[in-house]
């Protein structure tokens, strides 16, 4: 339960399995980026009923601090990602939510 004085602006955390090979790039300004697809599946209780929650979400990791952690990310890695979500426009012009990682933890 959130307290009324608690300010949460844009925070998102999800645990899942990497389902697409990470793609690493470097921007013209020299910032390193790593992008991959994370798949999440879980059972959630909603209005007293169990429902399956499922999503595939693109994750983007930027900057030297987290990039080193991405070297061991492979398809099938189970990870927890904490960050913020924003909208990116795809090549086909559609808007897609992307999770920008601020923390990554490997789950055994």
Curated annotation (Swiss-Prot):
Gene Ontology CC: one annotated term: primosome complex
InterPro entries, per database record: NA-bd_OB-fold (IPR012340), Primosome_PriB/ssb (IPR000424), Prisomal_replication_PriB (IPR023646)
A Pfam family: SSB_1
Gene Ontology biological-process annotations: DNA replication, synthesis of primer
Location of the SSB domain: 8-108
GO molecular function: single-stranded DNA binding
Keyword Lyase included in the entry's annotation: no
Alphabetic keyword roster: DNA replication, DNA-binding, Primosome
SUPFAM superfamilies per record: Nucleic acid-binding proteins
Top-rank taxon: Bacteria
Its job: Involved in the restart of stalled replication forks, which reloads the replicative helicase on sites other than the origin of replication; the PriA-PriB pathway is the major replication restart pathway. During primosome assembly it facilitates complex formation between PriA and DnaT on DNA; stabilizes PriA on DNA. Stimulates the DNA unwinding activity of PriA helicase.
Assembly description: Homodimer. Interacts with PriA and DnaT. Component of the replication restart primosome. Primosome assembly occurs via a 'hand-off' mechanism. PriA binds to replication forks, subsequently PriB then DnaT bind; DnaT then displaces ssDNA to generate the helicase loading substrate.
Family per record: Belongs to the PriB family.
Name this polypeptide is given: Replication restart protein PriB
Lineage, highest ranks first: Bacteria, Pseudomonadati, Pseudomonadota, Gammaproteobacteria, Pasteurellales
Gene (UniProt): priB
